[in-house]
């Protein structure tokens, strides 16, 4: 973990932050002021997770912004369709690593009730990602999210159900990319281009996806 001065020496110019800045490695705008303070350095995407946002719930919603031609399943596969939703929570493992848990809330219990300890023991939320802390400054943990954003994952993009309905096979990494990451006061908006091989050797399908992370 490096100090704040070392972080600045790595090229993070705080003075260029602006509320309307888009993080996009193809443009000159590489910093964004807003939720998670996303920025891009040498082609890598980074987020800063403040102490105050640990153990808070985040709602993820992924929609098709622009749909692939010729790949429909009755009423599915159109622009505007919601293809994933989930609830997440960042958690500190230690000073060198953060966990991301996917929250499954099928059961409830009163925190003041006698059954609550048993409820907690029967509802351990799954750890779906572990991020190394690259720097810590101003009570914020800097993590590299590049591989996560670029991956073929149902944590951010098409759910397993949606992939099955649309007959999507593996992601074509060389034909997929992160287009932009935009930060606001309570949410982060991620735009990506994703290309998939269709099951059964039926060709390729390219989608523009819009993923939102909203702090609840």
Where are these regions (language model features)?
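Auxiliary tRNA-acceptor-end handling modules of aminoacyl-tRNA synthetases
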Residues: 5-216
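Bacterial N-terminal signal peptides
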Residues: 1-3
């Amino acid at each position: 973990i490096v100090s704040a001065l070392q972080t600045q020496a790595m090229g993070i110019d705080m003075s260029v932050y602006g509320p309307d800045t888009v993080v996009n490695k193809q443009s000159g705008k590489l910093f964004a002021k807003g939720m998670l303070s996303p920025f891009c350095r040498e082609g890598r995407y980074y987020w800063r997770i403040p102490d105050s946002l640990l153990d808070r719930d985040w709602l993820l919603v992924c929609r098709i912004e622009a749909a692939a031609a010729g790949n429909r399943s009755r009423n599915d596969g159109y622009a505007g369709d919601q293809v994933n939703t989930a609830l997440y929570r960042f958690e500190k493992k230690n000073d060198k690593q953060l966990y991301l848990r996917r929250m499954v809330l099928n059961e409830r219990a009163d925190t003041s009730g006698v059954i609550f300890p048993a409820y907690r023991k029967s509802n351990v939320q799954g750890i779906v990602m572990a991020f190394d802390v690259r720097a810590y400054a101003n009570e914020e943990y800097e993590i590299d999210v590049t591989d996560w954003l670029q991956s073929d994952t149902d944590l951010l993009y098409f759910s397993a159900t949606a992939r099955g309905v649309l007959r999507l096979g593996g992601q074509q990494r060389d034909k997929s990319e992160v287009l932009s990451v935009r930060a606001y006061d309570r949410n982060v908006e991620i735009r990506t281009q994703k290309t998939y091989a269709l099951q059964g050797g039926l060709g390729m399908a390219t989608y523009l996806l819009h993923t939102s992370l909203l702090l609840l």
